[in-house]
Design a protein with these regions (language model features):
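N-terminal start-of-chain detector that recognizes signal peptides
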Residues: 75-78, 103-106, 133-135, 174-176
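Asp-based, Mg2+/Mn2+-dependent phosphohydrolase catalytic module
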Residues: 1-5, 95-98, 112, 116-215
Length: 215
């Protein structure tokens, strides 16, 4: 087995096959109110807060920011509570890491209550020391301090790996000195070549990850 003492996992697009909800949530919100959306992937393009502000202005919504936020949260809560699926091979890989004494934690942009619900429903919450929402702590994955915060939260030492699907987070983790496993996800297809250049190993699936770590 390759040396690994602790692992920091992203959730959406890495542990869960769930990125499409961020491509459709804004459109679903509008359609539920009888509005035909001009585009569906606002949050991917603009981020969550900017996307909400854009929706209010562009579609002349007679709603406050918080009202739109609450409506979107209902959509997301339903999705993570009932639908968001685990990626193939994840549970088997996590069990192998646990069997070898590897500490694990989740660092996600999703709200912690939603993340924990989805991980619990998929039977993998118990593998992790904690689930940390970067949005809730106010440090995002474009800042190397985010990964140090998460590492310190589980009192980890030794060789650490970050498991990520998004290029910007991969670049940040590398700049912070971490080894990085790039997990393939459709949502980052345009960045695939650049991702491969920046990771220690690029995996199309978790069977390949297991082989990389000689598990």
């Amino acid at each position: 087995m390759k040396k690994i003492d602790y692992a920091i996992f992203d959730m959406d697009g890495t542990l869960l096959d769930s990125m499409h909800i961020w491509d459709t949530a804004s459109g679903a919100f509008l359609m539920m109110r009888g509005i035909v959306p001009k585009e569906f992937d606002l949050f991917r393009k603009q981020g969550y807060k900017a996307g909400i502000s854009y929706m209010i202005d562009e579609y002349k919504l007679n709603m406050s920011f918080d009202e739109v936020l609450d409506g979107l949260q209902e959509i997301l809560w339903f999705y993570y509570s009932n639908i968001a699926p685990i990626k193939d091979g994840v549970k088997d890989f996590l069990q192998s890491l646990k069997d070898n004494g590897v500490k694990m934690i989740v660092a996600t942009a999703t709200e912690s209550r939603m993340a924990k619900k989805a991980l619990e429903r998929n039977g993998i919450l118990g593998y992790f020391e904690d689930v940390i929402s970067m949005h809730e702590i106010g440090i995002h994955k474009n800042d190397p301090a985010a990964f140090e915060y998460v590492k310190n939260a589980m009192h980890a030492k030794g060789v650490g790996y970050v498991f990520e699907d998004a290029l910007y987070a991969i670049e940040t983790a590398k700049s912070a000195g971490y080894k990085v496993i790039g997990i393939e996800d459709y949502s980052n297809e345009d960045d695939r070549d650049e991702i491969k250049k920046n990771v220690d190993f690029y995996a199309e699936n978790y069977e390949q990850v297991k082989k990389y770590f000689e598990l």
